[in-house]
């Protein structure tokens, strides 16, 4: 694991280590452990704040004070996986990491993000229930900016920010999960579609 700070998933959270009282840290781990158990038993859709409070043996208010909302809880559960993904993008080998041309990195980013969503899809979809989580949390802004910078690197000057937002929408967790689970589209086909899309966008720039 990279010894650096990463962009946080949750609004207002810190990317570095946070010092907690020992009892607060134990409560946090008990809540997260209970949340993971519930997800294993009944899926992310079955994880409610009421069920979590009951399983962890705490009041519902304690759960809300710790995580803010159900989406905030899902964001916390996703944090470790997101930090690992950020490390691969920012410091890992090319083409996902630095050192490859912009188009190659765009293709690799989309393919890797599709795989990430399919692995952590239930959590990612539940975390995206809040419009703020979907569009404005620091990690989401980071990926929009990453795509924008790669588009600029490839010579796009006709509103690359807006194009980055449009491309990001195709990697929306709920959209990807729907494509795979409802329409039976294979992940490899999604990745190939992303490759063709960004290639057309870049070469048309």
Label the predicted regions:
Residues 76, 90-119:
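Hydrophobic alpha-helical connector segments
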Residues 74-81, 120, 124:
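Alpha-helical DNA-contacting segments of helix-turn-helix folds
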Residues 124-129, 133-137, 141-144, 152-197, ...:
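Hydrophobic/aromatic-rich alpha-helical bundle segments in the mid-to-C-terminal region
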Residues 1-42, 46-55, 72-75:
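Basic, helix-initiating cap at the start of DNA-binding domains
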Residues 37, 41, 69, 91, ...:
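Conserved amphipathic alpha-helical interaction elements at protein-protein interfaces in regulatory
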Residues 28, 49, 71, 75, ...:
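Short, structured helix-loop boundary elements
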Residues 57-67:
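Short hydrophobic/aromatic patch on the recognition helix
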Residues 70, 77, 81, 85, ...:
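Hydrophobic/aromatic residues within well-ordered alpha-helical segments
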């Amino acid at each position: 694991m990279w010894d650096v700070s990463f962009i946080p998933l949750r609004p207002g959270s810190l990317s570095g280590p946070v010092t907690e009282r020992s009892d607060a840290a134990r409560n946090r781990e008990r809540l997260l452990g209970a949340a993971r158990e519930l997800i294993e038993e009944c899926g992310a859709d079955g994880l409610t704040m009421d069920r979590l409070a009951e399983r962890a043996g705490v009041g519902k208010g304690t759960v809300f004070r710790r995580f803010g909302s159900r989406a905030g809880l899902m964001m916390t559960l996703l944090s470790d996986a997101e930090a690992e993904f950020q490390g691969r993008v920012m410091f890992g080998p090319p083409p996902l990491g630095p050192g490859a041309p912009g188009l190659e990195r765009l293709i690799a980013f989309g393919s890797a993000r599709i795989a990430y969503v399919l692995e952590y899809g239930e959590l990612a979809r539940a975390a995206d229930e809040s419009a703020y989580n979907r569009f404005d949390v620091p990690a989401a802004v980071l990926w929009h900016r990453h795509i924008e910078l790669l588009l600029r690197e490839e010579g796009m000057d006709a509103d690359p920010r807006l194009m980055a937002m449009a491309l990001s929408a195709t990697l929306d967790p709920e959209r990807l999960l729907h494509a795979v689970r409802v329409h039976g589209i294979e992940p490899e086909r999604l990745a190939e579609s992303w490759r063709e899309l960004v290639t057309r966008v870049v070469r048309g720039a």
